């Protein structure tokens, strides 16, 4: 009898644990990447927001203060692809939003593809040839044999494609010239809901977009402002205003309603990419400016709209919401008074002097063709025709440009590709070295260096580390605030675990099981 009693006692102790370990797969996951969302600013602004929106999500779910990467990623498109794939750029292939084409000698989208055409867009884009890895979107569509509803919606084409992958039903973005919802025929046609929104003028700049940006709150403690959208900067300023996020939120809500009516047996995944880097005429508004505070307040309202709709349609135990902060710096930074000396790196001067130096060694020629994204591009055709040692020239070029104003150091790309010993300043350049079009010699610029002809302050802002949160609210996910950053490669596996699908093939990380420890 005693062994039986011990067995029954053990089972009675384990039963609550077994029940607490049970979790329900959500019918829908809405994943919101928020470019420019910072943990410090979020914690500062949300004190006066009340219990709905982001405060409600953070209270009910798990919050991590930051996302850790093995080396710095200075481009938000590379971050989006890395988070979605669970792998770094040398695996998934997307290291920055733009690449330099040595043939045409100009920069173009990293997803540029002449085999496809844009719909409501002049851009010819596709993930094919650029994105080499499987994303969470691809896994969900594949494991459901095409039954799952999967869409990605963003304000920029690169962002939408970077999170949609190859097999999403659609990647939808805002055309930067017209404001219309656009896509590429790689995904087929423009989804009917986006087409309907265009026809009803429910796109950026349409009848639903305000003509003046005023504070959402009537309280004047943050400061009052009124910005109009007109003239040559109209669409550009709209894209860097909170109204672009409003348009994405409104269209995403239509896809959520569509998914609920469709009642598929597989879970739905709607991926949104919002942007908090607000500005006007290409210049960002400063931290704690009334405009930035209003953008955060509007994000809170957008999250509230999404959660309220999910609660209404699906109920608390049948939906999941994931919010991921992504550092970004695309707009020129506002000028601030400072006593520090700012040095200027001049790419044109660098190329001219480098060609004189290399011509003295290898014969007169334009050996250096161009500069882009802290990278010098060599004339590979001339190097091959003249039978010059490419590595020898790269080494000489790196040694020479290291002495130029505004440059901390320079390193040939092949040294990074081979994993050779490298100084600490070269780490941010690591992800730039894995493509044939990525260039030949990579430059690390001084912290306060400005690049002649480029937006002031952008490079410095990209190199500055900021904390970006990870938030997950879902059935079976614990309500907790973590004190340590999570690894980037745990995001996709954790969401795959939540949806009960395999994690992306290139993802080596494991799910964050601490998320699912109910108490």
Protein language model annotation of sequence segments:
Residues 351-391, 457-499, 513-519:
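Substrate-binding rim/cap in mid-to-C-terminal beta-strand-loop elements of soluble/periplasmic
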Residues 8-16:
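Bacterial N-terminal signal peptides
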């Amino acid at each position: 009898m005693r062994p039986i009693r011990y067995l029954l006692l053990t089972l009675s102790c384990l039963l609550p644990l077994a029940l607490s370990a049970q979790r329900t797969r959500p019918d829908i996951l809405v994943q919101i990447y928020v470019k420019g969302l910072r943990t410090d600013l979020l914690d500062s602004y949300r004190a006066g927001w009340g219990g709905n929106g982001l405060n409600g999500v953070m209270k009910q779910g798990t919050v991590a203060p930051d996302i850790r990467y093995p080396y710095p990623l200075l481009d938000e498109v590379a971050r989006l692809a890395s988070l979605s794939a669970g792998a770094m750029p040398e695996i998934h292939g997307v290291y920055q939003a733009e690449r330099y084409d040595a043939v045409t000698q100009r920069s173009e989208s990293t997803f540029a593809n002449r085999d496809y055409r844009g719909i409501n867009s002049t851009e010819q884009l596709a993930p094919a040839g650029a994105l080499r890895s499987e994303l969470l979107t691809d896994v969900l569509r594949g494991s459901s044999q095409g039954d799952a509803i999967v869409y990605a919606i963003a304000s920029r084409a690169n962002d939408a494609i970077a999170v949609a992958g190859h097999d999403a039903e659609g990647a939808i973005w805002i055309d930067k010239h017209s404001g219309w919802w656009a896509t590429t025929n790689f995904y087929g046609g423009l989804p009917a809901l986006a087409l309907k929104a265009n026809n009803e003028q429910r796109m950026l700049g349409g009848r639903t977009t305000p003509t003046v940006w005023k504070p959402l709150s009537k309280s004047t403690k943050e400061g009052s402002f009124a910005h109009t959208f007109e003239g040559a900067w109209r669409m550009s300023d709209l894209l860097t205003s909170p109204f672009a996020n409003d348009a994405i939120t409104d269209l995403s809500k239509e896809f959520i309603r569509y998914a609920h009516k469709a009642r598929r047996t597989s879970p739905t995944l709607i991926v949104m990419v919002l942007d908090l880097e607000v500005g006007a005429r290409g210049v960002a508004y400063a931290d704690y400016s009334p405009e930035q505070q209003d953008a955060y307040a509007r994000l809170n309202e957008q999250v509230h709209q999404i959660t309220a709709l999910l609660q209404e349609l699906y109920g608390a135990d049948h939906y999941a919401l994931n919010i991921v902060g992504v550092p970004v710096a695309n707009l020129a930074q506002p000028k601030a008074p400072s006593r520090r000396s700012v040095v200027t790196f001049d790419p044109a001067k660098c190329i001219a002097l480098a060609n004189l130096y290399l011509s003295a060694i290898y014969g007169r020629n334009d050996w250096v063709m161009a500069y882009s994204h802290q990278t010098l591009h060599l004339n590979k055709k001339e190097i091959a025709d003249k039978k010059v040692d490419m590595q020898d020239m790269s080494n000489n070029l790196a040694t020479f440009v290291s002495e130029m104003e505004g440059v901390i150091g320079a390193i040939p790309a092949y040294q990074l590709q081979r994993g050779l010993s490298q100084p600490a300043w070269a780490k941010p350049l690591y992800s730039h070295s894995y493509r044939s079009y990525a260039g030949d010699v990579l430059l690390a610029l001084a912290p306060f260096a400005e690049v002649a002809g480029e937006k002031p302050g952008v490079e410095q802002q990209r190199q500055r580390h900021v904390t970006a949160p990870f938030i997950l609210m879902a059935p079976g996910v614990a309500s907790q605030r973590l004190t340590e950053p999570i690894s980037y490669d745990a995001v996709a596996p954790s969401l795959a675990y939540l949806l009960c699908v395999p994690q992306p093939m290139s993802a080596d990380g494991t799910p964050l099981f601490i998320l699912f420890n109910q108490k």
